[in-house]
Amino acid sequence: MIGLIQRVERASVCVEGKEIGAIDRGLLVFVGIERADSAQQAEKLAQKLLNYRVFEDELGKMNLNVQQIGGELLLVSQFTLAANTQKGNRPSFDPAMAPQEAEPLFDYFCQTVHTHYPHTATGRFGADMRVHLINDGPVTFWLHV
């Protein structure tokens, strides 16, 4: 399971022209689910995400996590993160989990995060989404569990 996290001043996601999720300061997290992923990876990524220290302390060092700063999370599914880009000029999505299996796992991941930290918004699995964000930094990390 992959989490591409971006530190943001604010972010939102729209489907069919309607905003369905928005956050202020916090983390925008694009989530890619691979074929072999399970609830175990979802739980591990949730814990890593909630505890990953990407916010600056009073000395300017990245030493605080999203919970410590009272930030928010926006979780957005993105199957393209699981693409194989090693060969040719077109990505292969064979490593990505099939949508009918990935959707319940994404939902489980979101519920797990929300249970531990309720300041969480989500996109809509499988939808054509418009994601708007203002990066802070920019600070972007690839978490792969």
Swiss-Prot record:
It is found in: Cytoplasm. Homodimer. Its EC number is 3.1.1.96. GO terms for cellular component: cytoplasm. Gene3D superfamilies: D-tyrosyl-tRNA(Tyr) deacylase. Pfam families: Tyr_Deacylase. One of its GO terms (biological process) is D-amino acid catabolic process. NCBIfam families: D-aminoacyl-tRNA deacylase. An aminoacyl-tRNA editing enzyme that deacylates mischarged D-aminoacyl-tRNAs. Also deacylates mischarged glycyl-tRNA(Ala), protecting cells against glycine mischarging by AlaRS. Acts via tRNA-based rather than protein-based catalysis; rejects L-amino acids rather than detecting D-amino acids in the active site. By recycling D-aminoacyl-tRNA to D-amino acids and free tRNA molecules, this enzyme counteracts the toxicity associated with the formation of D-aminoacyl-tRNA entities in vivo and helps enforce protein L-homochirality. It catalyses: glycyl-tRNA(Ala) + H2O = tRNA(Ala) + glycine + H(+); a D-aminoacyl-tRNA + H2O = a tRNA + a D-alpha-amino acid + H(+). This is D-aminoacyl-tRNA deacylase.
